[in-house]
Amino acid sequence: MSLIATERRVALRRRALWLEYFTVGWNVLEAFVAIGAGLLAGSVALIGFGVDSGIEVISAVGLLWRLRTAGPHAEVAEESAAEKRALYIVAATFFLLAAYITYEAIGSLLEREEPLTSPVGIVLSILSLAVMPALAFAKQRTGRAMGSRALVADSKETWVCSYLSLALLIGVGLYAVAGWWWADPIAALAMLPVIVWQGWQTLTEAREHHDADHA
């Protein structure tokens, strides 16, 4: 590998690490605020938003492990093994998020829970919409440049966080304006197809990676 290529790999890895460190820091803060405000407001989408932030922390930690375990000078086999494990971690977090949202949203619909209007939820979703798309795009671009399917998959989870921000804003906003108690859980459930599909796609990529390693 040429010196220029090595320096580029080092720079890309450094950028990826900083993106994941930022993801962890932002989502830890977001989770505390969202879950706390959601419990006070009785908001399924807001709590689910906070749990999603926590789950995204797990995904980001998995990517940090992958990046630190297999650096720019790692052997091909070592990098491949780390990439495969990171893909499985990201896939698991997608399914974990889908299961949680399903449980909480259906429970809210069956019990006809009416959340209080949550200004915190609206502000939080707006802030997240301002940050998450840019973060997701940066991860996606870096992952493709590195040839890391795990980082690209993690960027998709960050995109899901953006979608949930929009769903949260719609759900809480409709309740505040029109009093539609069901808008909150429906907004959360509307994200399920995207989340499950991305989880399945990531799991498929992990299996393909596994098969390639054993070919």
Segments predicted by a language model, with ranges:
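Alpha-helical transmembrane cores and adjacent cytosolic helix/loop segments
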Residues: 1-215
